[in-house]
Amino acid sequence: MRTLCSLLLICCLLFSYTTPAVGSLKSIGYEAELDHCHTNGGYCVRAICPPSARRPGSCFPEKNPCCKYMK
């Protein structure tokens, strides 16, 4: 019975340790959004876009605005 409980505990700990994997997927998605914003001539800001810029999208995961200067 003790072995079964120990095995169950180990399995629970292994399966609950998915947070770093989710965190790394988030950062991969963030890099992709950031690159997409920069490739289109934009930049990510923490606040709102200045009046001389428009907002073509957002930067993943924090939903920061992606601003691009109007021509």
UniProtKB/Swiss-Prot annotation:
Keyword NAD listed? The answer is no
Disulfide bond positions: 37-66, 44-59, 49-67
User: What highest taxon heads this organism's lineage?
Assistant: Eukaryota
Q: Where in the cell is it found?
A: Secreted
Give one GO biological process term: defense response to bacterium
| InterPro entries in the cross-refs | Defensin_beta-like
Family statement: Belongs to the beta-defensin family.
Q: What name is this protein filed under?
A: Beta-defensin 2
